[in-house]
Regions:
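Class I SAM-dependent transferase core
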Residues: 1-49, 54, 84-101
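Conserved SAM-binding loop of SAM-dependent methyltransferases across substrates and taxa
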Residues: 60-73
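Conserved SAM-binding motif I beta-strand of class I
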Residues: 75-80
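Short alpha-helix immediately C-terminal to the canonical SAM-binding loop
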Residues: 85-87, 128, 155-156
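Conserved SAM/SAH-binding loop
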Residues: 104-110, 125-126
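Active-site capping/gating segments
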Residues: 152-191
Length: 191
């Protein structure tokens, strides 16, 4: 785990440095980024070995880069339509030597060759219903979704928009402070 911690620390330093000149994300200090890293790590107990994962709207690398660092046996596709953010992600992958991470600089609806994923992650990307609709061609009954979301109130409102005959879900509190953060774990119930 020591090597993983070194990579996370290197990522943190690079992200802070790159953000100063390129304004990648709305984080100005190490403490805020460390909370983002902790939140990203909170999905690890739900990740199994050798999964094919896509992180929607990877932005500054949360949770995608952190997932790639902490789960080297998984293949992680980082989907990011913004060219500036994609460049940062590609540069980070090279600097950290992450052979298991790949950047897709497109919108999901523009990329049909990615296939089916075992796990779909997203953080601050879109509504739950929109994520499920966008990934219909990239998921099957075995696909799990781990969506990093805010308050249970907001999540409940979003989940009221999905067809509960087709999906089962669980809301898991990450206990991240100072803001309430939760993981929404979702699976299809049928094809």
């Amino acid at each position: 785990m020591f090597e993983k911690n070194d990579l996370i620390n290197k990522f943190l330093k690079n992200a802070l440095k790159y953000n100063q000149s390129h304004n990648l994300f709305n984080r100005n200090n190490k403490e805020e980024l460390q909370r983002d890293i902790s939140e990203s790590i909170s999905i690890n107990p739900f990740i199994k070995n050798k999964l094919k994962i896509i992180d929607l709207g990877s932005g500054g690398g949360f949770p995608g880069i952190i997932t790639a660092i902490t789960n080297p046996e998984c293949k992680i596709y980082l989907l990011e339509k913004n060219t500036k953010k994609s460049y940062f992600l590609k540069k980070t992958i090279i600097e950290l030597g992450l052979a298991n991470a790949f950047v897709v600089n497109k919108r999901l609806e523009q990329e049909n060759s990615l296939g089916i994923f075992d796990l779909i992650t997203a953080r601050a990307f879109s509504s739950t219903k929109n994520i499920l609709d966008l990934t219909i061609n990239n998921s099957n009954k075995e696909t799990q979704y781990l969506l990093l979301k805010g308050t249970k109130k907001t999540i409940t409102e979003e989940l009221n928009e999905i067809d509960t005959n087709n999906y089962i879900y669980e809301i898991i509190n990450t206990e991240e402070k100072p803001k309430e953060r939760n993981i929404v774990a979702i699976k299809k119930t049928n094809e």
